[in-house]
Amino acid sequence: MNKLFEKTHITLFENNNKTVHSGRFNIILPDVFGFCGGVISALKKLENIIKLNDGRKIYLLGEIIHNPTVNQYFISLGVNIVPEFNLDSIFKIAEEDSYVVIPAFGIPLDLENKIRGRYKNIIDTTCKNVKSVWDFISLEAKNKSTIILYGKPGHPEVQASISRAKNDCCIIILPDLKAAEYFSTLLSSKELKSLKHSINNISSDKGIQCYNSQHFNQKRFALASQTTMLYSETLKVEKIARSTIEKKGHILSACNTVCRATHLRQKAAHAVCKQIPDLIFIVGGYESSNTLHLYKLAQKYSPVYYLKDAEAIDSSEIKHFIPEESNEIQASTKQVLKNVSSIAILAGASCPFTVINEIIEKLKAI
């Protein structure tokens, strides 16, 4: 793979208990960080097509992963990225002999079927863990279960997953623990039959989304989660749902769909956070779900700054993202690093190793 994605620089620090002295700072790295196997597989597949260099255009259906450094790299090599909000435009712009690349998150089933019916050169980089979610949802949809999916409603993985349930079962998306608790309250209500109406009324307030409420099955439920959610919260959501549903004598089938790589990164990040560093940098794309959850985890321990890449840091200011406000702001480097001696760096599974190394080099120079 391209040197952008290599781990060589960071391996210098790995035999030193994940701590390196960088200038005036002690930099703490987790046991596990950087690209997961699914991301590496997706990037290799796309790189292999580029290396063929046979003159055919390459169209990527949305970002390959949610990291701007990675996507910009592929754009520089001539890959055409179709905007996630307008994937159907592929049919207007791509010739039939073009390479059409399905990203790691997957795409909605109807769109995939149309693309496979029109194009011959399709490169599917969908993560195998995501496909496991699809298999579970497809099976439970055939059983007419009410599908509960714990995840970010607008995320492409979630949209691809719920499309596997087709239109013959009710699908409910819960974005967070508060939504799960509220939904549990509705399930506990004696007026359960009115849930299909209630859920639509509160969606805008609680962030809950409901599809096909006319097929709501109050006796059989199936629970899955987006593969990059916080593992600890996923367990809590299952506990909340199971307690309520089984108390009523109904059925809940649950599938642990948080991928192992995500779980390991969260576990390693938690171990670093418990050391209570003076400061924590979270590094990754602003749209990255697994990076966002590392941010949420780290907030409980130390001051946290969410950085897109190494360009976010210079001698005068640090650009960082506030997820709660969906806003990038600037802070004085001098003020942020005042009285700081230890800095933990946590990176999402879609963050290149070289970006982490560049941040360490930036800190050395400050």
Predicted regions and their residues:
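The feature marks the mature, well-folded catalytic cores of soluble enzymes
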Residues: 1-366
